[in-house]
A protein has these predicted regions:
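Short beta-strand segments enriched in hydrophobic/aromatic residues
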Residues: 34, 46, 158, 212-214
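A short catalytic or substrate-binding loop motif that flags glycine-/basic-rich loops and adjacent residues
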Residues: 22, 121, 132, 146-150
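Beta-strand elements of modular eukaryotic interaction domains
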Residues: 18-19, 119, 143-145, 197-199
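A short coil-to-beta-strand element that immediately follows conserved catalytic motifs
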Residues: 118-128
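Conserved short histidine dyad/triad with adjacent acidic residue
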Residues: 130-146
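Non-heme Fe(II)/2-oxoglutarate
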Residues: 2-118
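Catalytic core of Fe(II)/2-oxoglutarate
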Residues: 145-146, 150, 161-217
Length: 217
């Protein structure tokens, strides 16, 4: 097995007892990674949330991100340390913290198995639900531009019955329309600039993002 932490291969999935499809070099899909019963628990949470719940949860998720990344709790403290923090007004109602901590732990332990054989990496696991309703898109970006430690992005899909909302890699001309329960993993590199196309009328798109970082020794 390679000692290069960037080179995730199908062997890593096999050792973790997952069957992965490599749909493009270094883009992997694992079907049914999130189990039906787990999907039901997640659906129960966001089905009971109102718009104010989403807004409050988004703000709390930002505070957690700042604390995790910079070791401080407020925007002012992070900015005083020289970090640039920007609030995206379009996303204030689109992220919610996963309330079922047991489920969150189960998903992260399962995900960590895939990367267990790679030295020098650490999982920044799922912790929030991301939603995109009609007209909402995720702009093109490379995750390591905001955090240079990011090696891989992981996206777990709660549903796949939405229209539009494809994961799009414009530089390699790849579009992915996931199914419920799918896990998609891809590297944070220039060729893998990516975004999510606008969701059309109908069901909302729900996904759980996670990242794999280069460990700071």
């Amino acid at each position: 097995m390679t000692s290069d932490p960037l080179l995730l291969t199908k062997e890593n999935f096999a050792l973790a007892e997952f069957e992965a499809e490599e749909i493009y070099p270094r883009i992997f899909v694992v079907h049914d990674f999130v189990r039906p019963a787990e999907i039901e628990k997640l659906e129960l949470q966001f089905s009971t949330m109102n718009e104010e719940d989403w807004r409050v949860s988004y703000t709390e998720s930002l505070y957690r991100f700042i604390e995790d990344q910079y070791g401080v709790r407020t925007f002012e403290e992070a900015q005083a340390l020289g970090h640039r923090i920007e609030l995206d007004g379009e996303w204030v109602d689109k992220n919610a913290i996963i309330q079922d901590t047991s489920l969150m732990q189960t998903l992260n332990e399962r995900l960590a198995k895939i990367f267990a054989g790679l030295p020098g990496v650490e999982l920044r696991g799922v912790g929030s639900i991301q939603r995109q309703y009609e007209g909402v898109r995720l702009n093109y970006h490379i995750d390591s531009e905001s955090n240079p430690r990011v090696l891989y992005a992981c996206v777990l899909y709660v549903n796949g019955d939405f229209e539009g909302g494809e994961l799009h890699f414009p530089r390699i001309d790849v579009k992915i329309k996931p199914a419920a329960g799918d896990l998609i993993i891809f590297p944070s590199a220039d060729d893998y600039l990516h975004g999510v196309l606008p969701v059309e009328a109908g069901p909302t798109r729900y996904a759980l993002p996670a990242f794999v970082d280069k460990r700071e020794d």
